[in-house]
Regions:
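Amphipathic alpha-helical coiled-coil segments
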Residues: 39-54, 128, 132-152, 162, ...
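Short, charged, amphipathic alpha-helical segments
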Residues: 115, 178-187, 317, 385-393
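Small/polar (Gly/Ser/Thr/Ala-rich) solvent-exposed segments
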Residues: 38, 61-84, 88, 100-127, ...
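Gram-negative outer-membrane assembly/targeting C-terminal domains
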Residues: 14, 411-431
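Periplasmic alpha-helical coiled-coil/stalk elements that build and connect Gram-negative outer-membrane
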Residues: 2, 25, 131-243, 255, ...
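Bacterial N-terminal signal peptides
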Residues: 7-14
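Hydrophobic, lipid-facing positions within transmembrane beta-strands of outer-membrane proteins
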Residues: 92-98, 238, 296-302
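Bacterial Sec-pathway N-terminal export signals of envelope proteins
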Residues: 19-67, 73, 217-257, 305-306, ...
Length: 431
């Protein structure tokens, strides 16, 4: 019998662990199914197709053209006004044309710009990854925290109900006054209001979780206050990592490179272009005189658009200004990166210190509440109903503060990774 009970509890434990959902599993779910992230992945595919379109400019084009017409002359007169003989024809024309651009100073720059565009799309995808994964962490930790606070408030309501019943009994015995019972009733009403508020917050956070991550069974979520990956151990290392990985900086660098290519493309509009074409055509029932004709045409074309009313020079000036703008944005991104990493590091340190303080606060509040409640119930001490209410309130606030501070500490760790540029699927091992 003892072995049977042991086996049952082991099976129950294994089943519980198997069905539990960790933050890693939630992040994988968000990574694979989030709509915003999937939309950004399509943007990468668009950039890849743009490169293929630009690459086609280097290849020859082939065109086949066929036309067929039918003539039906209703009346034909000669110069003297008499009727002339009518000889209608039904011409058929078929041609195939091969054309190759030989010189185009802009297509090389355009091709390089599209290659940069793929790198840019990848960086934007990684940035969107960070945003969605951080939202998922917020949703995951937020749902757990609101569930904890709902449970804390539920237990507080039960405690207030028990206290009110005790005070009513003590009132009948003459141990407390009617005002003490009124205080307990007021305290219960306040506890019920907070409980209702916590229930509403839980529902809101559950909806947010389902929107960002997907469906969830709240009872399967495992709480964690430590990041699932290593975080930098110093501010200096965090800053150095951000210089390599920060996506905003990388995006600004790539957009600057694209602006430089736009200048080259604009200048190429003032340069000559050259193309070569070969066309073979076949005509049947060509005219009343000739029946068939087959000919080949080899054609070389050189074009030099040297004047367009100042439009092309204005385009060059415009792109020069865009380049200056992108340079300024890059400088600003570098400065913001330093500020964000430093702020994230400071927030992590302060949230950890605050968490330790709140833990000590909860422990002290529990000891104080236990002692005050025991004195009050014994009737031997000088503790009043108000003392118990205040003690319960301090403990409640400390417990809720602990739930919030544990979540804030977890978010601070991931926010540091986000500011560095490491809150990605590859670093978190989501693939």
């Amino acid at each position: 019998m003892k072995n049977l009970i042991t086996t049952f509890f082991i099976s129950l434990l294994l089943f519980g662990n198997a069905s539990a959902q960790t933050i890693l599993q939630a992040l994988k779910q968000a990574y694979n199914g989030n709509v915003e992230l999937n939309a950004e992945r399509e943007n990468l595919i668009v950039s890849e197709q743009d490169l293929k379109i630009t690459r086609s400019e280097y290849l020859p084009s082939a065109t086949i053209t066929t036309s067929k017409s039918q003539e039906d002359t209703n009346k034909l007169t000669n110069q003297s006004g008499g009727d002339a003989s009518i000889s209608d024809i039904d011409p058929l024309s078929t041609s195939i044309k091969l054309e190759q651009t030989l010189i185009d100073f802009g297509r090389g720059a355009d091709y390089q710009k599209k290659k940069i565009g793929i790198d840019l799309a990848i960086k934007k995808l990684l940035k969107k990854e960070q945003e969605i994964l951080y939202k998922a962490i917020e949703a995951y930790s937020g749902l757990i925290a609101t569930k904890e606070k709902e449970e804390i408030n539920r237990k507080n309501v039960e405690l207030k109900i028990s206290q009110l019943e005790t005070d009513k009994i003590r009132l009948e015995r003459g141990e407390v006054k009617l005002s003490d019972v009124a205080q307990s009733e007021s305290s219960l009403a306040g506890a019920e209001a907070k409980y209702i508020q916590s229930q509403n917050e839980f529902v809101t956070n559950k909806l947010n979780y389902e929107n960002v991550i997907g469906k969830v069974d709240i009872n399967t979520l495992q709480k964690s206050i430590q990041a699932i990956v290593n975080i930098p151990i110093s501010l200096e290392s965090a800053i150095e990592l951000s210089k390599i990985n920060n996506h905003d900086v990388k995006i600004a660098e790539l957009e600057l490179k694209q602006a430089e290519k736009d200048i080259t493309i604009a200048k190429s509009d003032l340069a000559p272009t050259a193309s070569l074409s070969l066309e073979r055509s076949y005509n049947e029932d060509l005219s009343t005189t000739y029946d068939e004709r087959e000919k080949d045409v080899l054609k070389a074309t050189v074009s030099w658009p040297f004047y367009s009313g100042g439009k092309k020079f204005a385009t060059i000036d415009k792109n020069q200004s865009i380049k200056v703008r992108q340079r300024l944005l890059l400088d600003n991104a570098i400065k913001n990166n330093l500020t964000e990493v430093t702020s994230a590091w400071a927030n992590l340190q302060s949230s950890e210190s605050f968490l330790n303080s709140v833990r000590a606060q909860v422990k002290a509040a529990e000891i104080a509440n236990e002692g005050i409640t025991a004195e009050y119930l014994s009737g031997a001490g000088s503790r009043s109903t108000l003392d118990v209410i205040q003690s319960n309130s301090l403990l409640l606030n400390a417990q809720i503060s602990l739930a919030d501070s544990e979540r804030n500490y977890l978010l601070a760790q991931y926010n540091l990774l986000k500011s560095i540029g490491l809150l990605t699927s590859s670093y978190l091992n989501l693939k």
